[in-house]
Regions:
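Short, conserved micro-motifs composed of acidic
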Residues: 1-248
Length: 248
């Protein structure tokens, strides 16, 4: 486990280890990336045990291009076990690359909605998918896929992650500080806002990538964002960084 120490403001590892039999089921000789738990990473294990929606989304490239997969999981005494075999989301996947699915719980009360990235139209853009009324996307026999134009650019827009009404993603569009930058957009109940660069306190002339935003609760001033960057000062290559960002 990773815990946050309120006294010294540091994240620390505990000795409470968990086994992820789930990962033994999804990992292959191919590339697996973009993991996403449907219960949005609650802080404490007893919250996990109360979760009703236990799906694990990720991407893999068994056919050469990235496709989105899902595997159900259940809670064991000390970890997570698969509750079935992984399966591809064939209604979403194409001959191009699809990945980094993130559920959008605030979009509709009776139709499950998610966002993901794809380069089906030439460059990477962020797409929205909606399932049938009253059904999960993974249960639907048909889905509606759209590309929100307000989020799109002529560059590559990738790795969307939604927490509450905020989406964070990475893009090498104009208006950044160089390479891939982190951007955010806010959902107003009907549409996404025009993306805003997260600024030079987070972004650099290097690449900032794959942001994950975690709502921190009422006791905290900021939400937690974790991302990767190949900026100088790390251990080499891409390293993980965390930062507090204002709640929106």
């Amino acid at each position: 486990h990773i815990v946050f120490d309120l006294i010294d403001g540091e994240f620390k590892m505990t000795t409470d280890l968990q086994e992820f039999g789930l990962l033994d089921s999804v990992n292959t000789e191919n590339n697996e990336l973009g993991p996403y738990f449907t219960n949005d990473f609650p802080y404490f294990h007893y919250f996990w045990k109360e979760a009703e929606d236990t799906r694990f989304f990720y991407s893999s490239d068994p056919e050469g291009d990235l496709d989105i997969f899902c595997c159900g999981y259940e809670f064991a005494d000390n970890g997570f076990d698969p509750s079935g075999d992984p399966f591809a989301l064939t209604l979403l996947n194409t001959e191009f690359n699809e990945g980094y699915l993130s559920l959008h719980s605030g979009a509709s009360e009776n139709m499950e909605t998610a966002c993901f990235m794809s380069d089906r139209d030439g460059s990477f853009d962020i797409y929205s998918v909606t399932g049938e009324e009253g059904k999960l996307i993974t249960e639907s026999s048909s889905v509606t896929v759209t590309r929100p134009t307000v989020l799109s650019s002529t560059a590559d827009d990738k790795c969307p992650y939604i927490s509450g009404n905020v989406m964070v993603f990475t893009s090498d569009r104009e208006g950044g500080f160089g390479g891939f930058d982190l951007w955010y957009s806010v959902y107003n109940g009907q549409t996404w806002s025009a993306p805003v660069n997260m600024g030079d306190l987070i972004n650099t002339e290097y690449d900032e990538y794959r942001p994950i935003l975690v709502q921190s609760g009422e006791s905290y001033v900021n939400d937690l964002m974790v991302f990767s960057s190949n900026r100088p000062g790390g251990k080499g290559g891409f390293d993980l960084y965390y930062v507090g960002v204002p709640k929106r």
